[in-house]
């Protein structure tokens, strides 16, 4: 993970700046299966809805979900299908993710 070449999320299509991913199975869509997700300091994920369940393990750093929940290194999280959220990382983080299906972007609520 430390020396692998991560692929930046396409900022124009996703709105994400400072995020990247490493797919372990390149034949699967970037949001499905198992992948490593990195957030640079100050990065935010795009608000999205999960089509299936998602599980993630915080390898290093910390991220804060839009509901204020803070996840730190060593935390394991399960998100139910249909969960809507986005995350922010003040100091950056690396997360191992398993997602059952693709994410759908949602517009931010006022």
Residue ranges and their predicted role:
Residues 40-42, 60, 79-83:
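Short acidic (Asp/Glu) patches
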């Amino acid at each position: 993970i430390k020396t692998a070449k991560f692929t930046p999320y396409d900022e124009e299509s996703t709105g994400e700046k400072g995020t990247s991913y490493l797919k372990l199975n390149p034949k699967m869509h970037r949001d499905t299966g198992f992948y490593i997700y990195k957030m640079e300091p100050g990065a935010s994920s795009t608000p999205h809805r999960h089509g299936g369940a998602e599980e993630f393990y915080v390898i290093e750093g910390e991220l804060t979900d839009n509901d204020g929940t803070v996840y730190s290194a060593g935390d394991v999280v399960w998100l139910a299908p249909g969960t809507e959220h986005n995350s922010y990382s003040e100091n950056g983080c690396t997360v191992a993710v398993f997602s059952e299906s693709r994410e759908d972007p949602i517009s931010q609520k006022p």
